């Protein structure tokens, strides 16, 4: 495979290996191993040219690998973005597996169609007993206890807002609270909330975890800090619920997802299903919801943080780099950053 400019070592690796072994190199670390290439989509794999994406897919496939997309998007959103890219002349191939909704659902490519893996869904249900409606009912009461409600001064500010009645109408169960429920990717496996600036997230998680445990539900928490530029693009209903009293001083907004799983759960399931070792798993991401995958580097998996990663992901990966050698901080954004990281992993395996 011809590899261009900024990855000068890759072509030499392929040529030298074929010369010495006369077989195709498989896996990221070992000869004749299966491997996984797992990529976030928005601002990661999809943030690149047709040629860059093509190179990444070829590198995974050429090493006896399965290509996996791990995203916060729903299946429908992924298919829509795939079509949009095609109109721009960019081919985003259908993956072998899709981990969607931040790990809540897993789809398998069967004859070109992404089919929901019911075994994964059943496993999560049996393990957590998670039901979004039950979580929401519990949250309606929990969010309005004094600890998580606006104080008198804050509530007075709220009532003085020009759009107070619209806020109240859009948020009838939560408008007095520092916590509000919203709908972005509705699912039985996810309950979505905005958490006001100033709320202690660790305390909140501990408090609601206990409340849900009382009704037999286990939950995970995925929090994302969305900057102003993203929040400003949201529909009107979301803007009403993420008003100024809930935002940070820089107008960013913390979202908290209560769910039975995260992206790492999907990765762990595929590892078991396909009988693949951690060192043969390579992942890349850019956002807070990719931290769960980055944590798998502790077990030997490889994680690439692309250069346009969120502040939280960068901070976590910088800390991890001091402990493990399988975390790579790329100099490049998106797909180009993935290629740089893959080159680093392959070089390490050859040199070792």
Question: Can you name each region flagged by the protein language model?
Answer:
Residues 50-184:
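Active-site phosphate-binding/coordination module
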Residues 256-352:
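Mg2+-dependent phosphoryl-transfer enzymes with acidic/Ser/Thr/Gly-rich catalytic loops
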Residues 1-29, 352:
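Non-Sec secretion/translocation targeting segments of pathogen effectors
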Residues 39, 101, 284-286:
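Active-site flanking residues adjacent to catalytic metal/cofactor-binding acidic residues
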Residues 31-50, 294:
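Asp-based phosphoryl-transfer active-site loop
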Residues 82-88, 206-212, 311-322:
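Short, aromatic/basic amphipathic alpha-helical patches
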Residues 149-284, 288-296:
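Conserved acidic, metal-coordinating active-site core of Asp-based
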């Amino acid at each position: 495979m011809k590899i261009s400019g900024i990855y000068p070592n890759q072509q030499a690796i392929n040529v030298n290996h074929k010369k010495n072994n006369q077989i195709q190199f498989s896996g990221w670390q070992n000869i004749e191993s299966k491997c996984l290439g797992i990529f976030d989509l928005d601002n990661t794999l999809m943030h690149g040219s047709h040629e860059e994406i093509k190179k990444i897919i070829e590198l995974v496939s050429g090493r006896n690998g399965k290509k996996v997309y791990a995203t916060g998007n729903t299946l429908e959103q992924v298919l829509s973005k795939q079509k949009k890219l095609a109109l721009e002349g960019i081919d985003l191939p259908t993956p072998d597996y899709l981990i969607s909704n931040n790990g809540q659902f897993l789809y398998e490519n069967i004859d070109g169609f992404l089919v929901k893996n019911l075994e994964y869904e059943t496993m999560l249900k049996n393990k957590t007993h998670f039901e979004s409606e039950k979580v929401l009912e519990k949250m309606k009461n929990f969010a309005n206890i004094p600890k998580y409600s606006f104080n008198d001064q804050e509530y007075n500010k709220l009532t003085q807002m020009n759009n107070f009645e619209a806020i109240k109408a859009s948020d009838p169960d939560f408008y007095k609270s520092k916590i509000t429920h919203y709908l972005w990717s509705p699912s039985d496996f996810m309950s979505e909330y905005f958490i006001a600036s100033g709320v202690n997230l660790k305390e909140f998680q501990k408090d609601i975890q206990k409340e849900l445990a009382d009704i037999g539900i286990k939950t995970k928490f995925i929090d994302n800090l969305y900057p102003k530029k993203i929040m400003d693009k949201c529909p009107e209903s979301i803007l009403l619920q993420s008003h100024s009293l809930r935002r940070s001083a820089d107008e960013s907004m913390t979202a908290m997802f209560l769910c039975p799983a995260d992206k790492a759960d999907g990765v762990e399931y595929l590892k078991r299903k396909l009988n693949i070792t951690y060192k043969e798993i390579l992942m890349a991401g850019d956002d807070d919801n990719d931290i769960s995958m980055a944590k798998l580097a502790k077990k030997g998996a490889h994680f690439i943080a692309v250069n346009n990663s969120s502040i939280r992901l960068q901070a976590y990966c910088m800390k991890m780099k001091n402990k493990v050698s399988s975390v790579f901080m790329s100099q490049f954004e998106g797909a180009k950053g993935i290629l740089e990281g893959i080159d680093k992993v392959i070089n390490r395996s050859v040199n070792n």
